[in-house]
Amino acid sequence: MKENIKPATGRLGVLVVGVGGAVATTMITGTLAARKGLAKAIGSITQMAAMRMQDGKEKLIKDIVPLADLNDIVFGGWDIFPDNAYEAAMYAEVLKEKDLNLVKDELQAIKPMPAAFDHNFAKRLNGTYIKKAATRWEMTEQLREDIRNFKAANNCERIAVLWAASTEIYIPLSKEHESLAALEQAMKENNTEVISPSMCYAYAAIAEGAPFIMGAPNLCVDTPAMWEFSKKMNVPISGKDLSLIHISEPT
């Protein structure tokens, strides 16, 4: 297969589902601080890790692989509460106020879009900042519009979507997940028993050409329907968990 690796040029929009959560605000704060030279990107393979070359010398991965520069990243996303990233990070109390204040202005500028949410899939949460949609298909169309609008408003060349929200309830793999046609039909028929909000986010991202990374262990991109859609659109999907067991309780 012929490789066609394009250079990472232009602005990269990173849209996070659960952008006001502890995981997201900690990640965003660290990234903003690192790109201002106020902190090191400890734990980041792309920024700190090295590769051994044929001559035996080591070079940083970011100097070899065509990756986005930290300065080109624009953060945004969705949340079930309207707090900006600074307010949300203060509430989470993962980082100290003095550390958050180093990038306070940037954090305050990150304001969430209303989330696609269903209380039945996250029973411990009661979101107040959520989308109104008659069907899962309509919910997905709203998310697609959000992605397009964010991309245009922030002059982004490309978008990636990351799920950093709470784990949804368990649902088994069903016939609606076996093919793209069946999945789309279930979304249009508003079969809320088998179509979760996370699936709506994943579908919307893929449809808009945005890679989707799943950060929770619930059923989402690990279905034949999503694999089919990913292959059809030539858009990467990945992930199953961000070790959520260490940082939050499943809902």
Task: Show which residues each predicted segment covers.
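Glycine- and other small-residue-rich loops at beta-strand/loop junctions that grip anionic moieties
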Residues: 194, 215-219, 240-241
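Residue-level detector of conserved catalytic or cofactor/ligand-binding positions
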Residues: 245-251
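Rossmann-fold dehydrogenase core element
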Residues: 229-242
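Short gly/pro/ser/thr-enriched loop/turn and capping motifs at secondary-structure boundaries
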Residues: 220-222, 244-245
